[in-house]
Amino acid sequence: MGIDSSLPNLLDLVGLKVATISKIEPVASELPWLFSDLMKFVNQSKYQRVDNKGKVVLVETMRVGLNFFGIENLIIVLTSLAFKRSLPQITEPYPMIKLRIWEDALAVAISCKQIASLVGVNQNHAFCLGMIQAMGKVVVSKLYFRLFETVLREALVETQDSQKHEEHAALTRITPSGPFLNHLIDKYALGVSARLIDKMAMKRVFIANAMFEVANNKPAADISPLALVLKQGKAYAQYRILKRYKLIDVEQSKAFIRTLGMPAGALELLKATDIRSLDLRMIND
């Protein structure tokens, strides 16, 4: 339903200053999906390297894949791959839900990382929190579609067995409600994310308290620096997404930006940042 149970230990290990690929590889291998997903990621055309004969050099081992971007970037890579793997697959009649959740999570994570770089907050923790804060949306969405399917199936069987033909026909036309799902996400998602992160019980990736502060909607003046980064990253990502889909006009944009209380230089940095795709070349710059 949520994050892979082996991920917290792996992220904690990667967070150690003395971490090495030889120590990380056995733990990484406990995630059965990681090898194939990591190979697809590092062998993307934008990351491909060529030898002196111009032939593309493919990455084919877990060890090389884990070390491809450096240990310092592994938390970002692993968190992104794990989150993407968790996205809901069956969301008919709303096939774009999976894309929208990923789009939001990535935009928030990248925005948080960039803001963190300006205020002395750990950038890896900021990215990790910015992405995993969206796990509540994943869990709520999966539960909603699963429960809808279960209840509808039971109702169809009941009306068929009792020969209630009109009711049965009406039930076949019922589909999940997008507005109701949005209501459930607005009401429960952040709290679910906070409890999920707390259950992960990570000892070196310190993001649980900040998530609870944001989920409990504490005032900006009373929260930790990481929680403030998350609030600002979420707000800025929301602004950029609304602007992309032309759901906010220029004057609304200016007014909204003024409410964010962003640190000096943040808006300029974020304006120049691509928050739509994870590009490790940006991270390595």
Per-region residue spans from a language model:
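Short, flexible helical or helix-coil boundary motifs
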Residues: T159, A237-R240, L260, A264
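Low-complexity, flexible helical/coil segments
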Residues: K113-S117, Q163-H168, K243-K246, G265-L269
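A structural motif
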Residues: L156-T172
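Hydrophobic alpha-helical transmembrane segments of membrane transport and translocation systems
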Residues: Q252-K254, P263-K271
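Extended hydrophobic/Leu-rich segments
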Residues: E167-L171, L242, I257, L270, ...
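Conserved alpha-helical "signature site"
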Residues: M1-M131, K137-A155, I174-K254, I275-D285
